[in-house]
């Protein structure tokens, strides 16, 4: 175990809550009022002996996605899957988030004229039907929400020059996602992004992970043997929260380096933009688990810097895919703010957030602020809201702007709200009360001693 994590690059940077009620990576949620997706067709079987074009790396072909729609896809890499005994191609769907990149069999590529013609005919029919529909204008805010939910990737032209340059460099380094699946606990999960597992581990189509110690293995046989030997039944560190079957452990990266490295490698499979570190010592990790007779099963986590010069209360945050859409993402967000309240500070997640992270944080902030505004009577400033919630003033302003509840007047932001407007927002499913909330009575935690000294001097 000790040798395994020593050389591993680890992820402990950009935040990315993965999914509270948003479409998953394989879903194609259509915007309200749009026509069916183009290319949804069952193509005819190619004629016997019909020639196929040769698949070339870097070329673009029509590829059938898991939802049976056809889309242009660039072939990035090829490999022979030793576990399956077949040739596969790694494709990126043009215009889609790289989360949807995947390894596909040759038979999912339109390589014959018969198949290509069938897809083209269906696409032309779709465009004809679309042209007959009345024009539907959408606002910039609606377009932004649609792009976030449907994983629409920004083009380099839409980015500022610095961001575009960094994005190109990041894409070149993490272009191919070799680890396609992982098995952890009772779940087999499709990976979303590249993760820098060391040596041959990073080139395996599938890895097996122990859900307790997070050791990763190349072979199922090794995994089964390890399960019989592993003594762990919960994360290392200290349990700081327990209510019913929900438990949270605080793990210091300095004290449990290998575990935290393995956790970050696991997280990187589901988070795109990450700053990679070889050293996890500057971070503390908060592991959310579901507890049963077998042990404490990892659900998700967030990390935070022990000393954040930017005032961030979260460095990285993730709910594992099998546990998404059950309220755990917002629970982790709420938990991070409970810690900030005990530290008597305000905090914000490290930027940039992933698309799903933006949706989850914005939904959480909105719910918290709406609950306060609904019950409060009297005068309330943005500074007051920040002190009550530990949410930064900038995050509060941007959230209230999205709710049309703040105006800029005489050089400052002023809250403009009516009880009716608050109630209308609270009726929306987007801003409803999270299914799992943090019970502060069950939180057994105090700031580190050096932070307590700083607080006493304020």
Swiss-Prot record:
Motif Nuclear localization signal, residue range(s) on this chain: 140-149
- Spell out the Low complexity composition-biased ranges: 1-15, 25-36
Enzyme active site: 350 (proton donor/acceptor)
According to its UniProt record, the EC number is 2.3.1.48, 2.3.1.-
Q: What GO CC terms are in its UniProt record?
A: chromosome; histone acetyltransferase complex; kinetochore; mitochondrion; MLL1 complex; MSL complex; NSL complex; NuA4 histone acetyltransferase complex
Record's comment on post-translational modification: Acetylation at Lys-274 facilitates cognate substrate Lys-binding and acetylation. Although considered as an autoacetylation event, acetylation at Lys-274 probably takes place via a non-enzymatic process following acetyl-CoA-binding, which primes KAT8 for cognate protein-lysine acetylation. Deacetylated by SIRT1.
**So what does this thing catalyse?**
L-lysyl-[histone] + acetyl-CoA = N(6)-acetyl-L-lysyl-[histone] + CoA + H(+); L-lysyl-[protein] + acetyl-CoA = N(6)-acetyl-L-lysyl-[protein] + CoA + H(+); propanoyl-CoA + L-lysyl-[protein] = N(6)-propanoyl-L-lysyl-[protein] + CoA + H(+)
Which superkingdom, per the lineage?
Answer: Eukaryota
Mutagenesis or variant effect for residue 175 to E? In LIGOWS; no effect on protein expression; no effect on MSL complex assembly; decreased histone acetyltransferase activity
What's the effect of swapping residue 181 to N? In LIGOWS; uncertain significance; no effect on protein expression; no effect on MSL complex assembly; decreased histone acetyltransferase activity
* EC top class named in words: transferase
The cross-references to SMART domains, in alphabetical order and at most eight, read:
CHROMO (SM00298)
- Per the record, residues carrying Phosphoserine are 37, 42, 348
The record ties this protein, via Pfam families, to: MOZ_SAS, Tudor-knot, zf-MYST
> An example of a Gene Ontology BP annotation on this entry?
negative regulation of DNA-templated transcription
Sufficient for interaction with KANSL1: annotated segments = 174-458
| Residues annotated to bind Zn(2+) | 210, 213, 226, 230
Please name the CDD domains in this protein's record: CBD_MOF_like (cd18984), NAT_SF (cd04301)
Ranges of residues in domain MYST-type HAT:
174-447
Q: What family is it from?
A: Belongs to the MYST (SAS/MOZ) family.
Query: What is the purpose of this protein?
Result: Histone acetyltransferase that catalyzes histone H4 acetylation at 'Lys-5'- and 'Lys-8' (H4K5ac and H4K8ac) or 'Lys-16' (H4K16ac), depending on the context. Catalytic component of the MSL histone acetyltransferase complex, a multiprotein complex that mediates the majority of histone H4 acetylation at 'Lys-16' (H4K16ac), an epigenetic mark that prevents chromatin compaction. H4K16ac constitutes the only acetylation mark intergenerationally transmitted and regulates key biological processes, such as oogenesis, embryonic stem cell pluripotency, hematopoiesis or glucose metabolism.
The name on file for this protein is Histone acetyltransferase KAT8
Q: What is the lineage of its organism?
A: Eukaryota, Metazoa, Chordata, Craniata, Vertebrata
């Amino acid at each position: 175990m000790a040798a395994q994590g020593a050389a591993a690059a680890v992820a402990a940077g950009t935040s990315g809550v993965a999914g509270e009620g948003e479409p998953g990576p394989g879903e194609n949620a259509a915007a309200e009022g749009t026509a069916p997706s183009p290319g949804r067709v069952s193509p005819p079987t190619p004629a016997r002996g019909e020639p196929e074009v040769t698949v070339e790396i870097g070329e673009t072909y029509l590829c059938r996605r898991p939802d049976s729609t056809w889309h242009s896809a660039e072939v990035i890499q090829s490999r022979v899957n030793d576990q399956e005994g077949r040739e596969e191609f790694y494709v990126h769907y043009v215009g889609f988030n790289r989360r949807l990149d995947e390894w596909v069999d040759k038979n999912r590529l339109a390589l014959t004229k018969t198949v290509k013609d069938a897809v083209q005919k269906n696409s032309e029919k779709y465009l004809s039907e679309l042209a007959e529909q009345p024009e539907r204008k959408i606002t910039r805010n609606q377009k932004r929400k649609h792009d976030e939910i449907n994983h629409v990737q920004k083009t380099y032209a839409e980015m500022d020059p610095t961001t575009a340059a960094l994005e190109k460099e990041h894409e070149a380094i993490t272009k191919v996602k070799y680890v396609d699946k992982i098995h952890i606990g009772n779940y087999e999960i499709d990976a979303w992004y590249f993760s820098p597992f060391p040596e041959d581990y990073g080139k395996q189509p599938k890895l097996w992970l122990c859900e307790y110690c997070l050791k990763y293995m190349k072979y199922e046989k090794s995994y089964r043997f390890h399960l019989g030997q592993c003594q762990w039944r919960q994360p290392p560190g200290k349990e700081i929260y327990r209510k019913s079957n929900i438990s949270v452990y605080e793990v210091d990266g300095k004290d449990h380096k290998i575990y935290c490295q393995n956790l970050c490698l696991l997280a990187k499979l589901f988070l795109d933009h990450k700053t990679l570190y070889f050293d996890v010592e500057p971070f503390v990790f908060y592991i959310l688990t579901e507890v049963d007779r077998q042990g404490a099963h990892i659900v998700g986590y967030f990390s935070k810097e022990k000393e954040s010069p930017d005032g961030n209360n979260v460095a990285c945050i993730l709910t594992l895919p099998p546990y998404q859409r059950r309220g755990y993402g917002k629970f982790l967000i709420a938990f991070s703010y409970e810690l900030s309240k005990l530290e008597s500070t305000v905090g914000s997640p490290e930027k940039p957030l992933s698309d799903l992270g933006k949706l989850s944080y914005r939904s959480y902030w909105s719910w918290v602020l709406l609950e306060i505004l609904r019950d409060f009577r009297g005068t309330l400033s943005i500074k007051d809201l920040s002190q009550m919630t530990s949410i930064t003033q900038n995050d509060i302003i941007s959230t209230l702007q999205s709710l049309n509840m703040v105006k800029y007047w005489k050089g400052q932001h002023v809250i403009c709200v009516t009880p009716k407007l608050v109630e209308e927002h609270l009726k929306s499913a987007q801003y409803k009360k999270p299914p799992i909330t943090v019970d502060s009575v069950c939180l057994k935690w105090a700031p580190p001693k050096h932070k307590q000294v700083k607080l006493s001097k304020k």
